[in-house]
Amino acid sequence: MVNSSVTIYTLPCLSDNYAYVIHNSVSGTAAVVDVPEAGPLVDKISELNVPVTDIFLTHHHWDHIDGLPDLQAALTGSLGQVPARVIGAKADAHRLPALDKAVSPGDRLTLCGIEGDIYDVSGHTLGHLALHLPSAKAVFTADSLMAMGCGRLFEGSAAQMWHSLQQLRALPQD
C-alpha cells in the first residue's frame, strides 16, 4: 500500500501469516508490525536500506512473535543498526517478549515518525491490540479481523470479539 510518504509492505510468513514493514520516506525510517519469522523481514529491510525504529506486536501468539530475537539479532548484526524499540500491550506484557514500551487502548503512538492510535481488539486473545495509522489510511488488526472473518476465540468471548469488530467498523472507510 502506498500513501504519500508512507509505503506499507505486506510480507507472507510461515504458511498462513503476515508481517508488515511500514516505510516512511520523509523520516527515512521503518517500523515492523508482528514478527512471525525474521527472514522475509530481514530481506525487505535490507532491500529498503533504512533503519527500523519500532516493532509493534499485536498479541502474544507464537506466530506473531517468534521471529523477534532473530530480527533484532539481524538488525544489530548484518544490518548494522541499533535494536528497534519493541512495543506491545501493557495488559499482555507478561506473555510478550521484553517490551521497551507498553501501551494501552486509547494511547497515541509514534512509529517511524507516523502517529497511530491503539485499540483493544480482544476476542481472539485477551490484550490483543490493533494499530490505526490515520495518515497512512491503514489499520493493523492481526487475528482480530482477517479477509474471511475473524480469528478463533482462544481466550476472549464472542461478546468481546463483537465489540472489537464494531470498533474496527467505526474507523474511517478509507
Regions found by a protein language model. Give the residues of each.
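Residues that form or flank phosphate/diphosphate-binding pockets in enzymes
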Residues: 17, 63-66, 148, 156
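Divalent metal-coordination and catalytic microenvironments
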Residues: 22, 34, 59, 71, ...
